[in-house]
Amino acid sequence: MNPHSWLILKRKVRFGDCDSAGVIHFHNLLRWAHESWEESIDIYGISHQVIFPSCHSHENQNILPIVNCEANFLLPIKLGDLLTVKIFPKKISNHLFQVNTLFLKDEIKVAEGKIIHCSLDMNSKLKVKLPDQLERWIEASNINTHLKEC
């Protein structure tokens, strides 16, 4: 499978994404960053149930709360803009991973986001190793992708 298929996505700015000035409402960038890595794992072939446990499950599963997030707006993102979304996941430690997301319009960087997740046991809330399938996605995303993070 070509990493570009799960690391480079498209997003169109919709009316509901914008404020009264016609530019993206600030919180949507982080939502898009998170939705993009969710879409990426889906394209890669990982079931959402593996990454995001069901509240109905009684198994020992990991949860992945966000422990840090940032968004930088470099140029206005407007209604109707078609954006290319590039995802750069990386493992920070056995229990932490980061997903950097670049948003480009016509190959010009217009925004960037960063989200850091911590892997915790759902019951004890103690730090635990990242799920194996998530680690494989991170590893595969960093092998010969030729994607350059700006």
Swiss-Prot record:
Pfam families: 4HBT_2. Catalyzes the hydrolysis of 1,4-dihydroxy-2-naphthoyl-CoA (DHNA-CoA) to 1,4-dihydroxy-2-naphthoate (DHNA), a reaction involved in phylloquinone (vitamin K1) biosynthesis. Its EC number is 3.1.2.28. It comes from the Bacteria. Keywords: Hydrolase. It catalyses: 1,4-dihydroxy-2-naphthoyl-CoA + H2O = 1,4-dihydroxy-2-naphthoate + CoA + H(+). One of its GO terms (biological process) is phylloquinone biosynthetic process. InterPro entries: DHNA_CoA_hydrolase, HotDog_dom_sf. The lineage of its organism: Bacteria, Bacillati, Cyanobacteriota, Cyanophyceae, Synechococcales. This is 1,4-dihydroxy-2-naphthoyl-CoA hydrolase. GO terms for molecular function: 1,4-dihydroxy-2-naphthoyl-CoA thioesterase activity. Belongs to the 4-hydroxybenzoyl-CoA thioesterase family. DHNA-CoA hydrolase subfamily. The keyword Hydrolase applies. SUPFAM superfamilies: Thioesterase/thiol ester dehydrase-isomerase (SSF54637). Pathway: Cofactor biosynthesis; phylloquinone biosynthesis; Quinol/quinone metabolism; 1,4-dihydroxy-2-naphthoate biosynthesis; 1,4-dihydroxy-2-naphthoate from chorismate: step 7/7. The active site is at D19.
